[in-house]
């Protein structure tokens, strides 16, 4: 299997398993009174489950952490800050703008990744790649269209959503930079998740008594699915450029509602979901056929 086919396979798998991971984690969230600190706490426990899975399936990758260069360690430790800030900006944006608007704007992170990859990694920007992403964005817009006008949009809310897209886009560029330096996906994942725990847990320890141990064990178990999703995402970056990896990963927007329908009987518009899926697939196929994907 050549690099482009591997990239498409792993990118697609990352979207599928992210959709499943987010759906299951979302159901756990409904068991709690959600606050920012509780959300950070659950993220830490989820990432603990991912790190534990890495340590079980690839002990050698954990040992390789000590062989990383200083710039690699610093870069990886910045990822949870960017990811955490992005999620914070997204959550704050939904207070002041409609959920649909927040989803659409924050889902532009592949565009930020595409520009960041051009600046920092010298990846080329081809007309086919740009056209493909625009079609993907149209598909994403349709998935959230019904929620676009739930409430009035404010400048502050729009700014938060834009910042979320920027932080998520830069996160992907760092992933690619580190993987280009021959750091294994499992080593990167382990240090990235441990960094999240170290950074987030001290701030959330005060609410430990408010979360049931059974909920914590459940979210940690879901971390196994998160591991598969994140590993596939890393492999997509390894075998392709930033734009394709991110645009395939963003298909979780389709898979999430589908899993929610199959597992929890949540209502969805099947025809709308199919139309969105077709558009997102066409857009990703154009990016896949771009000569700049390797």
Language model: regions and residue ranges:
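Loop-to-transmembrane-helix transition segments
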Residues: 6-15, 63-89, 156-164, 210-232
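Juxtamembrane helix-loop boundary signature in multi-pass membrane transporters
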Residues: 1-12, 108-166, 274-294
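Helix-helix packing/entry segments at the starts of transmembrane helices
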Residues: 9, 13-15, 42-45, 100-108, ...
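Juxtamembrane C-cap of transmembrane helices in multi-pass membrane transport proteins
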Residues: 17-34, 49, 88-97, 105, ...
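Transmembrane alpha-helices of multi-pass small-molecule transport proteins
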Residues: 32-85, 167-171, 189-207, 221-224, ...
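Glycine-/small-residue-enriched transmembrane alpha-helix faces in small-molecule transporters
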Residues: 1-42, 81, 89, 150-177, ...
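Hydrophobic/small/kink-forming positions within alpha-helical transmembrane segments
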Residues: 19, 23, 80-88, 110-115, ...
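Alpha-helical transmembrane segments of compact multi-pass small-molecule transporters, enriched
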Residues: 49, 53, 105-119, 134-135, ...
């Amino acid at each position: 299997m050549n690099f482009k086919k591997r990239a498409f396979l792993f990118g697609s798998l990352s979207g599928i398993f992210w959709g499943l991971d987010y759906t299951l984690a979302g159901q756990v969230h409904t068991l709690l009174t959600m606050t920012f600190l509780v959300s950070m706490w659950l993220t830490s426990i989820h990432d603990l489950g991912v790190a534990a899975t890495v340590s079980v399936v690839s002990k050698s990758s954990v040992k390789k952490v000590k062989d990383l260069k200083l710039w690699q360690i610093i870069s990886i430790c910045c990822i949870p800050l960017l990811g955490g800030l992005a999620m914070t900006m997204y959550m704050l944006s939904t207070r002041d703008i409609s959920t649909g608007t927040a989803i659409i704007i924050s889902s532009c992170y592949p565009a930020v990744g595409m520009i960041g990859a051009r600046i920092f990694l010298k990846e080329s920007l081809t007309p086919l790649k740009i056209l493909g992403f625009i079609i993907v964005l149209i598909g994403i817009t349709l998935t959230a269209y019904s929620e676009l006008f739930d409430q009035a949009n404010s400048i502050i809310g729009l700014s938060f959503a834009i910042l979320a897209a920027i932080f998520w886009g830069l996160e992907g560029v760092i992933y690619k930079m580190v993987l280009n330096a021959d750091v294994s996906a499992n080593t990167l994942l382990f240090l990235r998740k441990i960094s999240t725990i170290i950074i987030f847990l001290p701030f959330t320890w005060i609410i430990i008594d408010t979360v049931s141990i059974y909920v914590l064990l459940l979210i940690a178990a879901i971390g196994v699915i998160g591991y598969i999703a994140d590993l596939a995402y890393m492999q997509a970056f390894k075998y392709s450029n930033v734009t394709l990896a991110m645009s395939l990963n963003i298909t979780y927007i389709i898979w999430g509602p589908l899993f929610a329908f199959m597992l929890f009987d949540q209502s969805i518009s099947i025809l709308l979901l199919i139309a969105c899926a077709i558009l997102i697939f066409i857009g990703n196929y154009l990016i896949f056929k771009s000569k700049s994907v390797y």
